[in-house]
């Protein structure tokens, strides 16, 4: 359970670390689910690193319905309740899950970005939970710009070639050059052990380095009371084919793809 201090920090900074939020058994379930996903990726899977990268950055999305370990952790652990408390929401809806595996030696960074501009969702009550099943040292962990969730939406770009495939070029402000001016930003980051999780707002700017050792993580994206469907004229990441025909713009995401998971 998150306390008042963590709730205040989440709303101020847009990211908090919660230690020991998952039990050893729950971490094992997540690990088993990740390994199942690696062995049999969905058709949504991708490799987000270059062919000449000595490691590999694997991603896959929206597998909770096919991988029972994922669904069990989402529904029976405390992460949905914690997300609800942090968002100040009366209920929590699952948006999607996301597996991110950087194999040892991966050079590919995760560049600075916000998550929500890639999505088909509007609303301020949002929360992602990043759950590692391996120890994560400082150089490989997620970094966050404190308070950036309170600022504007920033231009989403492809991670490897920095193309604007979503919002039209010039329609959103570009990201500042955080790496060149790190001293000008309050950057939050935590070394993590299995069982620890980072909860962050979908507009919080975040990034991560490569991986000197294997880094397997499971991320769960939750939505709160004010989240609504925001159809886009382009392919979102992840994509929900046919949803635009079933939910009008501005409608709550009341759909089997997005089940209520708390209370």
Predicted regions: what is each one?
Residues 90-92, 96-97, 108-110, 125-131, ...:
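Generic beta-strand structural signal
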Residues 114-126, 185-186, 192, 213-214:
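A short beta-loop-beta micro-motif enriched in histidine and acidic residues
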């Amino acid at each position: 359970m998150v306390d008042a201090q963590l709730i205040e920090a989440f709303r101020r900074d847009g990211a908090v670390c919660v230690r020991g939020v998952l039990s050893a058994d729950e971490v094992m379930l997540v690990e088993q689910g990740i390994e199942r996903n690696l062995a049999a990726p969905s058709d949504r899977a991708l490799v987000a690193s270059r062919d000449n990268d000595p490691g590999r950055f694997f991603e896959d999305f929206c597998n909770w319905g096919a991988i029972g370990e994922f669904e069990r952790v989402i529904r029976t652990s405390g992460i949905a309740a914690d997300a609800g408390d942090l968002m100040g929401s009366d209920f929590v809806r699952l948006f999607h899950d996301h597996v991110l595996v950087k194999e040892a030696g991966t050079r590919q960074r995760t560049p600075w970005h916000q998550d929500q501009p890639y999505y088909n969702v509007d609303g301020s009550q949002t929360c992602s939970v990043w759950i590692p099943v391996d120890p994560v040292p400082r150089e490989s962990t997620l970094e966050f710009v404190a308070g950036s969730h309170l600022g504007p939406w920033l231009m989403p770009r492809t991670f490897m070639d920095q193309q604007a495939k979503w919002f039209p070029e010039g329609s959103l402000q570009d990201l500042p050059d955080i790496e060149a001016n790190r001293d000008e930003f309050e950057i939050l980051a935590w070394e993590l052990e299995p069982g620890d999780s980072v909860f962050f707002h979908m507009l919080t700017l975040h990034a991560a380095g490569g991986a000197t050792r294997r880094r397997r993580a499971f991320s769960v994206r939750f939505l709160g009371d004010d989240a609504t469907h925001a159809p886009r004229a382009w392919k979102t990441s992840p994509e929900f084919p046919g949803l635009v025909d079933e939910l009008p713009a501005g409608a709550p995401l009341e759909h089997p793809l997005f089940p209520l998971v708390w209370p």
